[in-house]
Amino acid sequence: STGEKTYKRAIGVSKDSIPQETILEKLKAEGYQTGLISLTSITHATPAAFYAHVKDRDMHEEIAAQLATADVDFLAGGGRKFFNERSDDQDLFQTLLNRNYNLDTLALSKSKPDMRNAFIIEDEGLPSKTEGRGDFLKNASLEALSYFDANNKPFFLMIEGSYIDWGGHAKDAEMMIQEVADFDQ
């Protein structure tokens, strides 16, 4: 999301591993509200590309630490264990609370328009539609749009339907069909 070519597995850094400004960071500096929704861990490569700067996409604990101090107004997805079951024993949920986030680690609840909102509700990723996920993607998207609307500012929202890609890699046509239909809601 930087617009610059880099090396395989890099997140938000140049070929020389120098941090590059992401589109989310650029828009935030211009007064936009920002949001990320993912069916996988919020520290996974696609969402991380919008706020993190690391040499390797599997540096989930470092990516979570960067998210805890990033300027993201609304986030929803999985990855709970990278915030509270860390090798360094840091509690990044406390960091989010200290930064005035409305935080829910159990469910997608109602956002609060006067706060930043974080819904990190699974240890890793959410289940696929074929595994019974329900309407998380639709509900998270609607909640984010409601939040942004209440604040009446321009916004940037990245919504990732992770399982469309994963279903393709697995050659699982049923998963892909259900995930595309879910994303289309």
Regions flagged by a language model, labelled:
Residues Y51-G78, L97-L106:
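Acidic, His- and aromatic-enriched active-site or binding-groove loops in soluble protein domains
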Residues L75-S128, R133-G134:
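Long, well-ordered, tryptophan-enriched scaffold segments
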Residues L106-I120, A140-S162:
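Active-site regions of oxyanion-processing enzymes, predominantly non-cytosolic
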Residues E4-Y7, T34, T40-H44, R80-N84, ...:
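Solvent-exposed loop/turn segments at secondary-structure junctions
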Residues D16-I23, M59-I63, A68, V72, ...:
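Stable alpha-helical elements in mature extracytoplasmic
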Residues S1-I63, V72:
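Active-site nucleophile/metal-coordination loop of metallo-enzymes that catalyze phosphate/sulfate
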Residues A45-F50, D123-G132, A150-Q185:
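Active-site His/acidic residue clusters
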Residues A29-G35, A70-F74, R99-N102, D114-R116, ...:
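Loop/turn elements at helix/coil->beta-strand transitions in domains of secreted/extracellular proteins
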